Swiss-Prot record:
This is Ribosomal protein uS12 methylthiotransferase RimO. [4Fe-4S] cluster 2 binds at C144, C148, C151. It is found in: Cytoplasm. It catalyses: L-aspartate(89)-[ribosomal protein uS12]-hydrogen + (sulfur carrier)-SH + AH2 + 2 S-adenosyl-L-methionine = 3-methylsulfanyl-L-aspartate(89)-[ribosomal protein uS12]-hydrogen + (sulfur carrier)-H + 5'-deoxyadenosine + L-methionine + A + S-adenosyl-L-homocysteine + 2 H(+). The keyword Transferase applies. One of its GO terms (cellular component) is cytosol. Catalyzes the methylthiolation of an aspartic acid residue of ribosomal protein uS12. Binds 2 [4Fe-4S] clusters. One cluster is coordinated with 3 cysteines and an exchangeable S-adenosyl-L-methionine. Its cofactor is [4Fe-4S] cluster. [4Fe-4S] cluster 1 binds at C12, C48, C77. Pfam families: Radical_SAM (PF04055), TRAM_2 (PF18693), UPF0004 (PF00919). GO terms for molecular function: 4 iron, 4 sulfur cluster binding; aspartic acid methylthiotransferase activity; metal ion binding; protein methylthiotransferase activity. Residues 130-367 form the Radical SAM core domain.
Amino acid sequence: MNHKVGFVSLGCPKALVDSERIITQLKAQGYELVPTYEDAGVVVINTCGFIDSAVQESLDTIKEAMAENGRVIVTGCLGAKADVIKNACPDVLHISGAHAYEEVVNAVHQHLPPPADPFTQLIPPQGIKLTPRHYAYLKISEGCNQKCTFCIIPTMRGKLQSYPMAQILTEAKKLKQAGVKELLVISQDTSAYGVDTRYQQVEWQGKTVNTRFYDLCEQLGELGIWVRLHYVYPYPHVDDIVPLMRDGLILPYLDIPLQHANSRILKAMKRPASSENTLLRIASWREICPDITLRSTFIVGFPGETEEEFSELLAFLKEAQLDRVGCFKYSPVEGAKANDLDNPVSEDIKEERYHRFMQVQAEISRNKLKNKIGSTQTVLIDEITEDQIIARSKSDAPEIDGLVYLPKISGITVGSFAEVVITDSDDYDLYASLV
């Protein structure tokens, strides 16, 4: 019997971790993962449904798999909208929502029974990873308790469910033992970790720790590898983490989505609504940890956004001088409460504001990177091509930030650290030579 499974993982790093867990279970039960539809006995597609373009990509992928294979199991965020999938592809075998690991595996069992003698001893202790060996995503919770009006993640992934502290730390320890040099801490709301457990106390390696964001960062920092924080909602207690960055326990890098700067827009988004307070906090973080890299994301073209309110956002950008910034044009995701707001912004204006926003940020980034010329940086080697080495500094998360380019030199290996001197820069990347 064909025990081959095709697997497609779409969407964000949180979905990638879900895919890793499903694949680990399937491999442990003897299934073989294959890269093509035609060789597979069944195809599993982990979908994204966050914005309309992601929904369309997911539906297109399902249709392609149905056309080339015909035996498709669908899971992930879009699975929360089973009717959308059924309308587009009525013959899919099974549909489940996000983080439904057991349901997906059971569906595979139903339509493609596992082999009688699985080779579980071939599965590494840290499980199957879809990232390069030297870095891994560490998901610490599921779901979100926020009620942001532009977002439907709580509908798709449910309320906050923090993973047990010991489970997270055990996984982190296994990843380090497997050679991982960088952990990227992720969730829908990373800084809310432990809220749902009321910060319960647990025992870990002979000591008592609280199930809360600070304690988790402190314990991860003791591993002695890079620990990078993503999706950090700007709660007041985030300020307590910055000294850990200053002291070298975790990377001086904070991914903190701010979304806008105008108070009326922020209130309409149901986000923290004081840009003045945010600027004061940014100044405080930089005073405590001068090397901190601040990454954020913003939305332009939110319903009702006026030219004056957009200009306020640009002024905030110029004053905040953030290091890394992403920008999204507002997308009217089905089910989002913001869709009911008056005065939607036209697509032309969204596009024009997006380009103006990115122009401002490109200049900020260009000047910040130029100031790094002549400095010495520690970099992690990501890739070696025929003619160059591609690395990342402490300021650069994989996939979303800039890169550090080095001339190719023998003796350097992927996944190793190196000390480099920055020799040049452009809008988003650095160029360097070995010390």
